[in-house]
Structures are given as structure tokens and as C-alpha cells.
From Swiss-Prot:
This is 4-hydroxy-3-methylbut-2-enyl diphosphate reductase. Transmembrane segments: none annotated. Pathway: Isoprenoid biosynthesis; dimethylallyl diphosphate biosynthesis; dimethylallyl diphosphate from (2E)-4-hydroxy-3-methylbutenyl diphosphate: step 1/1; Isoprenoid biosynthesis; isopentenyl diphosphate biosynthesis via DXP pathway; isopentenyl diphosphate from 1-deoxy-D-xylulose 5-phosphate: step 6/6. Belongs to the IspH family. The keyword Cell membrane does not apply. Isopentenyl diphosphate binds at H41, H74, H124, S226, S227, N228, S270. Its cofactor is [4Fe-4S] cluster. Its EC number is 1.17.7.4. (2E)-4-hydroxy-3-methylbut-2-enyl diphosphate binds at H41, H74, H124, T168, S226, S227, N228, S270. Keywords: 4Fe-4S, Iron, Iron-sulfur, Isoprene biosynthesis, Metal-binding, Oxidoreductase. The gene is ispH. The lineage of its organism: Bacteria, Pseudomonadati, Pseudomonadota, Gammaproteobacteria, Pseudomonadales. Dimethylallyl diphosphate binds at H41, H74, H124, S226, S227, N228, S270. It holds the Pfam family LYTB.
Length: 314
């Protein structure tokens, strides 16, 4: 069996920053540090931070007074921010800056009283945070659509003042179809100047297409609740290549690889490289040859840390 590795794969700049914020907060202030929602959607990462003293909660009413709280990379609603401020909690915001960009777009449309359509997956924390940026008291409204059927059923009050934004971790191909449907139904709709789907999502989807084209099977390292990891698995399957989403080597079954000559491996943006290495090691034990890394797009984007952690960690 040959092993081919997608490039790029794994951690993006927003995930790197979010994990580092939790680690530095633990270093500087000591445990416990409370984190609202999993800081990133990866079991291995969350378990490691939990062992260091991070406490993960879903709502702020689970957080005692006078503690440090970190908002996850997925972002939070304005209501959550106001609740934290009202309680006087010390907050470090690990929201990915590319998610914050979408939040700012929604706030602007809300302030102008313009209606906004968010393309995204209902129930995902990023979507909940983005929807929660919109203040309908200025006369507008925000609508969530997931697919073309949702667009067909959508009714708005002022199509001449309508905008759309997207969740940052969607399938580019699926999102393009939804945008086309929105433009067909609402010709005056306006989108962001730059695509909201983040650079890392785009790069990893491009890389998995190349990988699936060269392999008999694709393994996507990522947790089941990771949106971008699920999109990678779906994309490989759409290209006709069997694909599995796995948290790590322990999820693999030997029988999957019967008759497989070329195995492709990629990782979602929240999955660390150590998990990929564990998968490779297991495959090598099962007789796979040395891995080959495909050529890909170089990523050199970094995001700065919150000032207080940046100074105190020196």
C-alpha cells in the first residue's frame, strides 16, 4: 500500500491561535480556566487542554463568578458577550479573526436595517454566534439557509436591500450553488467583497480533490463534530473515492484496506499533525510503504494573540 498525504492539511492559523490562547492563559493565570464550548472541534485537543486544567462549558451560567472565560474559535453572539460583561467576567476571545470578519459584516447590515441571509448549518456554534450579531430592532431581519430548497422557500421584505454572508467552513461547491440560487431569486442581492469561506477551508478542499483523484481510499483525520472535516470526507466521496472520518488510528479497521493500493490521508483544520503521524504508523505496521507528501499551497498566515497574554507570556 502507498500512502499519499494531502498538502496542506491540519491546523489553520485560527485554530493555532485559539489553542495557544487557552495554553497561555493556563500558563499565566493557572487553572482553572473556563472555556465556553470546545475551543476547537477536536477530541484530542480538548482532552489535552482539559488535563491541563481547562474546564469546558456550554453556557455562562455554568461559570462561577470572578474567573477567566475564553470564547471558542467559533465565536459567540452579542447576547453572550453582554452576559459576560454584565457579570464582570474576565474574557479572552479566541474567535477566529475570519469569523469576526463575518460578524462585522452582519453587524453593519443590521445597523443599516438591511436584511441578511446567512448560508450555514443550523445548530453549528459558528452559525449561532453569527446569527446572534444581528439586531432586528433597526427594522431588518436575518435568515438562515442551508441549501437550494431553503432558498426556494425564502421570502424577504426588501429584496432590493438584501445581503448574504456564509459560515466559514462550508463546502465551496455546495455554497456556490446556494449563492447562484440566491442570485437567481434575488438579482439585487449583494455578497461580501471577499468570499467568507476561509483560506484554510478552500486550500484543504482543493488538496483533498487532488488526493481523491490519485487514491483508492481517503482517510480524513478529524472529529465527528468538525464541520470542515466532514466537508472533506463528503468531497472525497463525491469524487467517487471511499472515505472515512476518523479521530485517530484507533478508529481504523484492518478490513477497510483489503485490496487498497493507494491510501490518501488529510486532516481537518482542527486536527493536530500528531494524529496523522499515528495513523501513518499504524498503516506502516499493516504493511504500507513510506508516505509521499503531495505538492500543495504554502500557508504562512498567522494571527496575533490578545495583548495581555502576549505580554505576560514573555
Amino acid at each position: 500500500m502507498q500512502i499519499k498525504l494531502a498538502n496542506p492539511r491540519g491546523f489553520c492559523a485560527g485554530v493555532d491561535r485559539a489553542i495557544e490562547i487557552v495554553n497561555r492563559a493556563l500558563d499565566v493565570f493557572g487553572p482553572p480556566i473556563y472555556v465556553r464550548h470546545e475551543v476547537v472541534h477536536n477530541k484530542f485537543v480538548v482532552d489535552n487542554l482539559r488535563q491541563r486544567g481547562a474546564i469546558f462549558v456550554e453556557e455562562l451560567d455554568q461559570v462561577p463568578d470572578n474567573v477567566i472565560v475564553i470564547f471558542s474559535a467559533h465565536g459567540v453572539s452579542q447576547a453572550v458577550r453582554k452576559e459576560a460583561e454584565g457579570r464582570g467576567l474576565k474574557v479572552f476571545d479566541a474567535t477566529c479573526p475570519l469569523v469576526t470578519k463575518v460578524h462585522m459584516e452582519v453587524v453593519r447590515y443590521s445597523r443599516d436595517g438591511h436584511e441578511c441571509v446567512l448560508i450555514g448549518h443550523e445548530g453549528h456554534p459558528e452559525v449561532e454566534g453569527t446569527m446572534g450579531q444581528y439586531d432586528a430592532s433597526n427594522g431588518g431581519a436575518i435568515y438562515l439557509v442551508e441549501d437550494e430548497a431553503d432558498v426556494a422557500a425564502l421570502e424577504v421584505r426588501k429584496p432590493e436591500a438584501l445581503h448574504y454572508v456564509t459560515q466559514t467552513t462550508l463546502s465551496m461547491d455546495d455554497t456556490s450553488k446556494v449563492i447562484d440560487a440566491l442570485r437567481a431569486k434575488f438579482p439585487q442581492i449583494q455578497g461580501p467583497r471577499k468570499n467568507d469561506i476561509c483560506y484554510a477551508t478552500q486550500n484543504r478542499q482543493d488538496a483533498v480533490k487532488e488526493l481523491a483523484d490519485q487514491c483508492d481510499m481517503v482517510l480524513v483525520v478529524g472529529s465527528p463534530n468538525s464541520s470542515n472535516s466532514n466537508r472533506l470526507r463528503e468531497l472525497a466521496e463525491r469524487m467517487g473515492t471511499p472515505a472515512y472520518l476518523i479521530d485517530g488510528a484507533e478508529d481504523m479497521q484492518r478490513g477497510w484496506f483489503d485490496g487498497v493500493r493507494r491510501i490518501g490521508i488529510t486532516a481537518g483544520a482542527s486536527a493536530p499533525e500528531v494524529l496523522v503521524r499515528g495513523v501513518i504508523a499504524q498503516l506502516r505496521e499493516w504493511g504500507a510503504s513510506e508516505e509521499q507528501e503531495l505538492e500543495g499551497r504554502e500557508e504562512n498566515i498567522t494571527f496575533s494573540m490578545p495583548k495581555e497574554l502576549r505580554v505576560k507570556a514573555l
